[in-house]
Amino acid sequence: AAAVATPSPTPYVKKIPVTLHFTEREISCPIEAVGIMDDVDKKGNPILDESGEPVKIMGTIDSEKVAAWLEDGPSPGEPGNAIINGHIRWKKVAGVFSVLSDMAPGEKMAVTYDDGSVMYFAVASVDVFTIDDWPAWVMEQSSDIRMTLITCHGEWNSSQGTSNERVIVVAKPLEDQGVS
């Protein structure tokens, strides 16, 4: 009897997002991977929660031209909440993510991946929350496929070293990926 070869399963390879395109605004920015880190005050001292543990935050990129993707989560287009942040301004220079507060539901954007493929998204919602009162769903994982973009907004709070609000844009993949 002839042996039947069992096909090997194709290993899963996570697509790495490399560029975010705000297609209707003709603006693009590179994306770099970041992780979760301890929050620190302006002097570099750890900020502690009520139990004395360091407060954890998503890393950012020190540039107005580059977005940060939380690599511990899914890539945009995979099941779950792909989180990307960027600066509204950096060292008094307007950042690429300054467009977020002007976006509207239905507006399109695209993500290019390290393999050259592209996935298109449409804005589902645009919300502004205070830094002290933004909902947990912004950073939580989900069963649906979504990309959450985050940037600062509002007045600068020098005591906290950040703006007092956050703009949160949630985008979902377009059903028709043939749209350009």
Feature map (PLM): residue ranges:
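Solvent-exposed, non-transmembrane regions of membrane-associated and secreted proteins
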Residues: 1-180
